[in-house]
UniProtKB/Swiss-Prot annotation:
Annotated Gene3D superfamilies: Alanine racemase, Lyase, Ornithine Decarboxylase, Chain A, domain 1
Function: Catalyzes the interconversion of L-alanine and D-alanine. May also act on other amino acids.
Protein name per its UniProtKB record: Alanine racemase
UniProt record, GO biological process: D-alanine biosynthetic process
Domain of life from the UniProt record: Bacteria
Keywords in alphabetical order: Isomerase, Pyridoxal phosphate
GO cellular component terms listed in the entry, alphabetical order: cytosol
Required co-factors: pyridoxal 5'-phosphate
GO molecular function, a single term: alanine racemase activity
UniProt xrefs under SMART domains: Ala_racemase_C (SM01005)
Catalyzed reaction equations: L-alanine = D-alanine
HAMAP family the UniProt entry points to: Ala_racemase
Gene (UniProt): alr
Length: 374
């Protein structure tokens, strides 16, 4: 009998990357392993994918440092850039790639570069011990997401200043789709046109705009780099599963029945007595709750899998446990496995039932959940 356990299939993760390469065969892959690799484990994901991709993308400097400290020597991109001077200095000393998305970041980089140049002009023995290296900068362009990025009309000003900066080794261009999972909305074509216009004066520089949905649906926008995220884990960026495209779910979330109880019609279950059975039945109590990251707001009827069949959650999810209706004829017993999502119960179905996105479910699992890698 096991408590809440997330089983991660390395084979499925590698399979999904190989499949992604068939969608973008000419492009380099920057695997997005931010947010603890979408909740699946930062370092295990990096180790599993290191020989299959050209680099990794992360959202926090700490993530980049952890990956590099394992001995990884490839490209690591900070997709939000550096947050302050200290982070910039570490980015320079560790030679991470960084996004530049605003005036403040550019000015800080120029300031540090000026100080660095002054140090270089000193005699060798008078220089400070810190050594910084020119790095690759990805200039973020706001093409319509309206979250991060310079306005298209600012691109040349930023480009010229970055080109003149001695701490910039190369400049790439990056943007992000806001509605790429809606192929018929027309907005993505608009973003592509803006990106093309903003970057066409710099034909020798690498470009990237396609993340998971862009990879699947917008081949014309694959450019030089694609940035797979959620699809690496066999999960759709929307509610329609992608297993029919050949993707394999990487995570199986499971636990065990810790009690099986007979329950009479008319009796309530759980906090607040929100569910009352209309018939005699058997209830299963499962070692899984919001303390493990399973949503407290999962409504009655949310599906789980017990011994190969779908059964509904009943009553409120509590911190450590939840209850399922096994049915009056149940032969289930204490210790039997309960699956919350995986290859036989797709996370997209669960997410849609709860009213959240799959991203939330996989990234909110807590440290109490046991992670096993196979």
């Amino acid at each position: 009998m096991k408590p809440a356990t997330a089983t991660i299939s390395r084979e499925a993760l590698r399979h999904n990357i190989e499949l992604i390469k068939t969608f973008a065969p000419q492009q380099k892959l920057l695997a997005m392993i931010k947010a603890n690799a979408y909740g699946q484990g930062l370092l295990p994901a990096a180790d599993t994918l290191a020989d299959l991709v050209e680099g990794f993308g992360v959202a926090r400097l700490r993530e980049a440092l952890e990956i590099q400290e394992t001995g990884y020597t490839g490209k690591i991109l900070l997709i939000e850039g550096f947050f302050d001077r200290e982070e910039l200095l570490k980015t320079l000393s560790r030679r991470f790639d960084t996004v530049i998305h605003c005036q403040e970041q550019l000015e800080l980089l120029e300031q540090v570069a000026e100080e660095w140049q002054q140090e270089q002009q000193k005699g060798f023995w008078k220089r400070k011990a810190k050594i910084y290296f020119p790095i690759n900068v990805w200039l973020k362009i706001d093409t319509g997401m309206h979250r991060l990025g310079v306005h298209p009309e600012q691109v040349d000003m930023f480009y010229q200043r970055l080109k003149a900066c001695p701490l910039v080794e190369s400049i790439s261009f990056v943007s992000h789709f806001s509605r790429a999972d809606e192929p018929d909305c027309g907005y993505t074509e608009k973003q592509i046109a803006i990106f093309e216009a903003a970057t066409s004066p710099y034909p020798t520089h690498e470009r990237s705009i396609s993340a998971s949905s862009g990879i699947l649906y917008w081949k014309q926008a694959h450019y030089d780099w694609v940035r797979p995220g959620i699809i690496m884990h066999g999960i759709s960026p929307h509610y329609t599963p992608i297993t029919d495209l050949g993707f394999k779910p990487v995570m199986t979330l499971s636990s065990s029945l810790i009690a099986v109880r007979t329950h009479k019609a008319g009796e309530p279950v759980g906090y607040g007595g929100t569910w009352i059975s209309d018939k005699d039945t058997k209830l299963g109590v499962v070692a899984m709750g919001y303390g493990d990251g399973y949503p407290r707001n999962a409504p009655e009827g949310t599906p789980v899998l017990v011994n190969g069949r779908i059964v509904p959650i009943v009553g409120r999810v509590s911190m450590d446990m939840l209850t399922v209706d096994l049915g009056a004829d149940s032969q289930d017993k204490v210790g039997d496995e309960v699956i919350f999502w995986g290859k036989d119960l797709l996370i997209e179905e669960v997410a849609q039932h709860i009213g959240v996105i799959s991203y939330e479910l996989i990234t909110k699992l807590t440290p109490r959940v046991i992670f096993e890698y196979e």
